[in-house]
């Protein structure tokens, strides 16, 4: 199904649903809460989701967003993700589960229905993941199917980074491209049939989680989906 929206900033948060510790702040989406002194609150998770559902059958989409990670130490945790899930998807466990998974089922692909591109600032030893900060593609599991190393100079830069995520409904390729103004470029892709995972309605949004010493902000966001049916004659 076709859907498009564009937020050059979040002066208006019409059609954004906030759950858990997420809230609108200074024309951004703040994914995890801070106290009255601006200090990140530990062990919290939040979602900011576009309210209107859409479907992925015979659909391609493209979304781009800008983000900043504000760190208050050299060991921040845990990161954030852009994710697709059914409309009733709740905020899940904080910490390394990124608000998207529960501890007892986090690595069980048959127990989850969520696909995400994660920006992981903390190495969790509880499950198999690289021993460095990374950007990854997650398919129904906290263990990423694709990862690329996220350079510390970018993680700690406080720069506004730009991420592009695209999905081709015909080739079933999900691609993420992330770029920093004075830093690295990151690209990763994975073949996954999203319409098979999600036969019904889905929503797209952001999930953030702490840890500590970190706050995640989304500064802008646009999205458009198109039907691939026209090409299938």
Curated annotation (Swiss-Prot):
Keywords in UniProt for this one?
A: Calcium, Glycoprotein, Hemagglutinin, Lectin, Manganese, Metal-binding, Secreted
Q: Which residues form a coiled coil?
A: none
Which positions in this protein are listed as binding Mn(2+)?
A: 118, 120, 129, 134
Instruction: Provide the glycosylation site positions.
Output: 26, 108
For this UniProt entry, which residues form the secretion signal? none
Q: Does the keyword Ion transport apply?
A: no
* Residues annotated as transmembrane: none
Listed InterPro entries? ConA-like_dom_sf, L-lectin, Lectin_legB_Mn/Ca_BS, Legume_lectin_dom, Leguminous_Lectin
- Major localisation: secreted
Can you tell me what the entry says about the temperature dependence of activity?
A: Heat stable. Retains hemagglutinating activity after incubation at 100 degrees Celsius for 30 minutes.
An example of a Pfam family matching this protein is Lectin_legB
Q: What else is known?
A: Hemagglutinating activity is independent of divalent metal ions.
Q: How does it assemble?
A: Monomer.
> What does the UniProt record say this protein does?
Has metal-independent hemagglutinating activity towards erythrocytes from rabbit and human. Hemagglutinating activity is inhibited by glycoproteins fetuin, asialo-fetuin, thyroglobulin and azocasein but not by free carbohydrates. Inhibits ADP- and epinephrin-induced but not collagen-, fibrinogen, thrombin- or arachidonic acid-induced platelet aggregation in vitro. Has anticoagulant activity in vitro.
The family assignment reads: Belongs to the leguminous lectin family.
The name this protein carries in UniProt is Lectin
Organism from which the protein derives? Bauhinia forficata
């Amino acid at each position: 199904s076709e859907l498009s929206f564009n937020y050059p900033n979040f002066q208006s948060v019409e059609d954004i649903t906030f759950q858990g510790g997420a809230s609108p702040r200074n024309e951004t989406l703040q994914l995890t809460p801070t106290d009255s002194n601006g200090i990140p609150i530990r062990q919290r998770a939040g979602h900011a989701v576009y309210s209107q559902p859409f479907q992925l059958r015979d659909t391609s989409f493209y979304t781009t967003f800008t983000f900043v990670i504000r760190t208050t130490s050299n060991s921040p945790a845990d990161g954030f993700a852009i994710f697709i899930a059914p409309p009733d998807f709740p905020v899940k466990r904080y910490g390394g589960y990124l608000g998207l998974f529960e501890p007892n089922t986090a690595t069980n692909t048959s127990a989850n229905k969520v696909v995400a591109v994660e920006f992981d600032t903390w190495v969790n030893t509880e499950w198999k993941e690289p021993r460095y900060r990374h950007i990854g593609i997650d398919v129904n599991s906290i263990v990423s199917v694709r990862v690329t190393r996220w350079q510390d100079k970018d993680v700690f830069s406080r720069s506004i980074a730009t991420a592009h995520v695209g999905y081709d409904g015909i080739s079933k390729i999900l691609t993420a491209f992330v770029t920093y103004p004075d830093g690295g470029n990151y690209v990763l892709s994975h073949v996954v049939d999203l319409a098979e995972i999600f036969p019904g309605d889905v929503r797209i949004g952001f999930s953030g989680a702490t840890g500590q010493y970190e706050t995640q902000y989304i500064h802008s966001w646009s999205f458009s989906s198109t039907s691939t049916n026209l090409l299938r004659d």
